[in-house]
C-alpha cells in the first residue's frame, strides 16, 4: 500500500485488513472480528482528494483489472497515475474476506451454514471500517455496478459529506420482487444438490453450476442470445445456447463457492436503503454527494426505470443510459459508452 510517497507508484498491491473490533449486523448478530482482502493502486495526492473506491458485483473480487479492465488501469479512465484506487472483496465473498468457509473465532471451526445473513448495509459498514483504517477522511468517488451499486448507494447514505461522487451503475435503491425471485430460483438449484447441507467446502458445487446458468439468462437479453447463440444449421438437439450455459455454470463453480453465492445473493435481496430511514425516497433525499445513476436500456434484471428513480430522488442526481444488446452485463462490456458518460459527468460536475 502506498498512501503517500515522494515517488509515483502505480503498481497494485494486495493486502488483508484484519479488524479486531466487533461488526454489528442489521440482524442483531455480530462478527467478533473479520477480515477483508483489498487492493490499492496509485497514491494519495497532497489534498488527499483523489480516492476512487471500486465496488465489485456478485462474484467479483478485489482486482478490478480483471473484470473492469476497460475503465481501470494505466491509461484508462481511472488511471492510477492520477488516482488512489481502492477495491475490497466484500464481506461474505470467497476471495480472501471473511466468508462461510472462514473459521468462527467463537469455536475455531468453519462457519459453514452458521454464517450470519448479511445485508448490503452490513457490507458497507465493513468497508467503512477499512476506510477508517486507511486514514481516508474523504472519498472522491465510489463506483460500482449491480450488487456493487447497491452497496455504493448504501455507503453514500452513511458517508454523508465524506463522499464527493457516487456512480451507481445498473443497480437500484431497493431490491425488486423480480430480482429476489431470480435469486431464489438460483438458491433452489443449490438446495437441490445432494451435497448441500454437508459441512464440506465443495458442498453445493453442482447446484451452483445450475444457479449460474439461471443467472446468465437474467444478465443478458434475448437479443444477445439471438445474435451470439443462433444456429446456422437445422437442429433438433445439442444447441449452442445449451453448451454455453453449461460452460458458464462450470466456469463459475470452479472459481467460486456455493455458500458465498448463497450469502451474497441474500444480501442483494435485503437491499433497501429506506429501511429504518423513513422509506426509500426519504433516504435518497438525504444523500449529500453528487450521484450519477447509469441504466442500461435492455437490462431485464435491474431495469433502467430503477436507475432513473435513483437520479430523480437524490438532490444532486444525473441519469445517463447505455444502449446495448447485452442487457445487465453491458456495464462490464460497453466501455466506450461508459467512458463517454463518465467524462461528461466529471466535466459537468467537477470542473
Curated annotation (Swiss-Prot):
Reactions the enzyme catalyzes: L-homoserine + acetyl-CoA = O-acetyl-L-homoserine + CoA
Compartments (UniProt record): Cytoplasm
GO cellular component: cytoplasm
Domain AB hydrolase-1: 51-334
EC class: transferase
EC code: 2.3.1.31
Catalytic residues in the record: 146, 299, 328
SUPFAM superfamilies, per the entry: alpha/beta-Hydrolases
Pathway assigned to this chain's UniProt record: Amino-acid biosynthesis; L-methionine biosynthesis via de novo pathway; O-acetyl-L-homoserine from L-homoserine: step 1/1
Principal cellular location given in the protein's record: cytoplasm
GO molecular function, one term: homoserine O-acetyltransferase activity
InterPro entries xref list: AB_hydrolase_1 (IPR000073), AB_hydrolase_fold (IPR029058), HAT_MetX-like (IPR008220)
Residues binding substrate, per UniProt: 212, 329
Family: Belongs to the AB hydrolase superfamily. MetX family.
Role played: Transfers an acetyl group from acetyl-CoA to L-homoserine, forming acetyl-L-homoserine.
Subunit structure of this chain's protein: Homodimer.
Protein name: Homoserine O-acetyltransferase
UniProt gene name: metXA
